[in-house]
Amino acid sequence: MRGRATKPRSHEATKERHGKATKPSRLHRDRLRHEATKGTVTRKIAFITGTRAEYGLLRSTMEAIHKGKGLQLQVVATGTHLLKKFGHTIDDVVADGWPVDARVPMQRGDDRALDQAEGLARGVAGIARFLEQAQTDIVVVLGDRIEAMAGALAGATTGRVVAHIHGGDVAAGDWDDTLRHSITKLSHLHFPATESAGRRIVRMGESADRVHVIGAPGLDRLAELVRHQRDGRHTPTITGMTRGRPADRAAAHRPSLALDASRKGEPLRVRKESRSRAIIVQHPCGRSAAHEKKVMNAVLRAVDETGLAALCIYPNSDRGHSGIVEAIEAHRRRADPERFRVVRSMARDDYLRALIEADLLIGNSSSGIIEAASAGTAVVDIGPRQRGREPSGSSIVHCDETHEAIRGAIRSALRKRPIMGGRTVYGDGNAGPRVAAVLASVPLDETLLRKTIAY
């Protein structure tokens, strides 16, 4: 459609785009050499990434597209990637060796619903301008956030093929389902994670031949890290700590939990009597900041009362996030630093390694439903945010948002023994290459762009 021969981006161009001179990483140099040998570009594929979490899920597909013959990868960074308040995670994208083709500011980082609406408008306009200038053929979006909505709207209204990963899911978060299903109707190709999600897309009127069930891309890198753990090649993120279940907890010696968003490696010390280790990831559900703060305080109180050592990760930028952050920071100031550490963000691999090493994941992150079972980690799923998602195993304990319910769920989850690397409904860890294979071969013609209700 719009493909034409292009030269690989030079390091000088990358320096100019990022506004600073930095030596290219080895991975970046390898990618530039690979671009130089790929020959004529026949289709350009833009990935829209707005958050730390969704970038981690897109990465395996980006790698597969980059290696594909005749394919040119484009990266558009937006959303909280560009906000210092949420860790400025665009730095992680660049550190991984990806030259960022466009940076499109959306949210300003405050906690008003209006900021989300205005951010969506800015995102659509900025992404659309890039797609036109870059002559993009296919736009790839993932999930249910407004950054994905902006990419889908920009792609559809400028006549691009829109490919949507993780459509068809059901989750009772703030407006997750509303956005996800709207993105489905804007998209031309669908890559659901499960068979039931695929059937749901077809019931929405999408043609079955546009739907490709691929599994969950969140398992792609995790499957490799689990193999490393089994082979003894695992690089600990929680250092020196053997996984402990209730039966062997007394014998386990866990000297330190070294996780730090500032990457200075400051250790979180765990006393020799050996505590179970938890990761806390609690996101807002679109309610008031005061309500979200109350829920987060209940989570932290329950964690304290059960004696866990915990790593707490900042929430996403959805409405109500400021209340969660206030609760976290207040707890940090009074908590024992040997038991409680806070990070704004974590690189995807660091998060997955920590998930493998932890005894519990507490909160309402989708990684508790999808990835945790394969990591061999029990889950306390709090509140309504993930209600409706297909469970990946029997190691998930759902509970209400009171501190009594959370405390009871923690104690129940600690008695579970999930199997690392076990099979789940979310596939086998090869989602990214499956997406890339379809995007590389699907005919880019008017038939694909012209959608009709299929019932």
Predicted features, each with a name:
Residues 123, 326-361:
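Donor nucleotide-activated moiety binding/catalytic core segment of transferases
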Residues 71-116, 126:
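Conserved nucleotide-sugar phosphate-binding/catalytic loop shared by glycosyltransferases and other
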Residues 44-49, 55-66, 106-219:
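Active-site and donor-binding regions of nucleotide-sugar-utilizing enzymes
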Residues 4-25, 32-37, 245:
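Arg/Gly-rich low-complexity intrinsically disordered repeat tracts
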Residues 48, 81-84, 187-294, 450:
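A nucleotide-sugar donor-handling region in carbohydrate enzymes
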Residues 414-455:
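C-terminal amphipathic helix plus adjacent low-complexity
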Residues 373-420:
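Nucleotide-sugar donor-binding patch of glycosyltransferase catalytic domains
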Residues 141-142, 149-152, 164-165, 190, ...:
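A donor-sugar binding/catalytic signature common to diverse glycosyltransferases
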